[in-house]
């Protein structure tokens, strides 16, 4: 009888652990697809004017085919410039969430590329890499931007949160000479910091 109680308790504890582990894995690692915006922009938003201005920009849709299963999407704002900024969004967001920065850089004379990270927004992919897989995707976007604007272009990469961590990972790669600067806004230094010390 005592063995049955202990065995039942251990089995129940194991099943609970599996259920909790499954929940957190799905939350942390699986795809995030933004639902269409149903509410209007609020005038109380600090970046209201910039976001409103961003909505009025003519955007090109760029697509990168990484392999047979992965297609990455981005919006590109062509400012007919030799300066380009690539803006990297955070976890559970998409490229358009960087609209305030996009308007600012556009007004400063930059072309602006706003990619949706793998498994975010319109981009496909099943799992989120928290910057590790995405760093290679951003290198592909950099090369595509150079191909579009020419070898004499200058590129700035800016990321926020997960995008900031991705930007710092990209900065450690062998990069084309056209990449001139990185801006990192509140990225994390490790996955543990991302989950256990959120901003």
Over which residues does each language-model region extend?
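An N-terminal hydrophobic leader/cap segment in hydrolases
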Residues: 4-64
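A short loop-to-beta-strand scaffold at the N-terminal edge of the catalytic core in hydrolase folds
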Residues: 61, 67-77
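Short beta-strand element of the alpha/beta-hydrolase
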Residues: 82-90
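The serine-hydrolase catalytic nucleophile loop
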Residues: 90-104
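Conserved alpha/beta-hydrolase
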Residues: 102-124
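Alpha/beta-hydrolase active-site loop
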Residues: 128-149
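Alpha/beta-hydrolase fold nucleophile elbow
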Residues: 149-161
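Hydrolase active-site cap/lid region
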Residues: 169-199
């Amino acid at each position: 009888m005592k063995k049955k109680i202990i065995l039942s308790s251990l089995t129940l504890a194991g099943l609970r652990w599996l259920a909790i582990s499954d929940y957190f894995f799905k939350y942390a690692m699986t795809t995030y697809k933004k639902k269409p915006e149903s509410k209007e922009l609020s005038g109380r938003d600090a970046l209201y004017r910039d976001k409103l201005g961003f909505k009025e920009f003519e955007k090109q849709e760029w697509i990168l085919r990484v392999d047979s299963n992965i297609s990455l999407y981005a919006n590109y704002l062509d400012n007919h410039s030799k300066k380009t900024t690539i803006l990297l969004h955070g976890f559970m967001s998409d490229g358009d969430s960087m609209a305030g920065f996009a308007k600012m850089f556009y007004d400063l004379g930059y072309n602006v590329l706003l990619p949706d990270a793998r498994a975010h927004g319109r981009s496909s992919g099943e799992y989120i890499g928290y910057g590790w897989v995405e760093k290679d995707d951003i290198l592909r976007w950099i090369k595509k931007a150079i191909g579009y604007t020419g070898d004499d272009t200058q590129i700035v990469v800016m990321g926020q949160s997960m995008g900031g961590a991705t930007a710092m990972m990209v900065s450690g790669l062998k990069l084309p000479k056209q990449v001139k600067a990185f801006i990192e806004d509140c990225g994390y230094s490790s996955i543990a910091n991302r989950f256990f010390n959120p901003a």
